Design a protein with these regions (language model features):
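Long, His/Glu/Asp-enriched segments that create or flank divalent metal/ion-associated functional microenvironments
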Residues: 1-175
Length: 175
């Protein structure tokens, strides 16, 4: 995804078009803002342009920061008035519920002994995720403990830092 260091190739946003009839379009804008601008594309483009940062920090970043920024970007796009309609807003809110569920699912399965079926049942009851995706995502969380939590935890930390900047800068703060 990241652009090449020498600028010879731009960053690329790959869209999964496999079985489009199974995809929800109500979250399309939320995903695009997460992946492109103001999300990952903006973040990774700026990272490679930094001059006083070691190369390894330009190209390898923590999941909590990178994905936290992606989630933060979904809300930032809302503040900027970029969502085109209420259906896309609903998609953003549904995605937010899904990311919050990750915290509960990961903790439930890896800390509280929840079964896969218990996790899927919770997921389906508390987010708008479709059954097939709930199964796939739950299997991912089983195989990769803590990774999915890092998204929301990163977002929460970025929001905390933003509040601090808003308080310190007052009227000078501007998104």
């Amino acid at each position: 995804y990241s652009p090449l260091p020498d600028g010879s190739r731009d960053g690329t946003y790959f869209l999964n078009t496999y079985k489009p009839e199974t995809k929800s379009i109500f979250e399309a804008e939320s995903v695009a803002f997460h992946e492109a601008i103001p999300g990952h594309h903006l973040d990774r483009t700026i990272a490679v342009e930094l001059e006083d940062v070691p190369d390894f920090q330009k190209y390898v970043a923590s999941t909590a920061f990178v994905e936290g920024w992606g989630l933060y970007s979904e809300q930032l796009a809302n503040e900027m008035g970029l969502y085109s309609n209420d259906i896309q807003q609903l998609g953003r809110l549904g995605n937010d519920a899904w990311r919050a569920c990750r915290l509960v699912l990961d903790t439930g399965m890896h800390g509280m002994g929840w079964s896969r079926d218990e996790a899927i049942k919770f997921f389906r009851a508390n987010s708008p995720i479709e059954e097939i995706n709930a199964n796939i995502e739950t299997d991912r969380y089983i195989a990769w403990p803590g990774q999915a939590c890092s998204y929301k935890m990163g977002q929460l930390k970025i929001e905390e830092l933003r509040r601090k900047a808003e308080n310190e800068l007052g009227n000078m703060f501007d998104i």
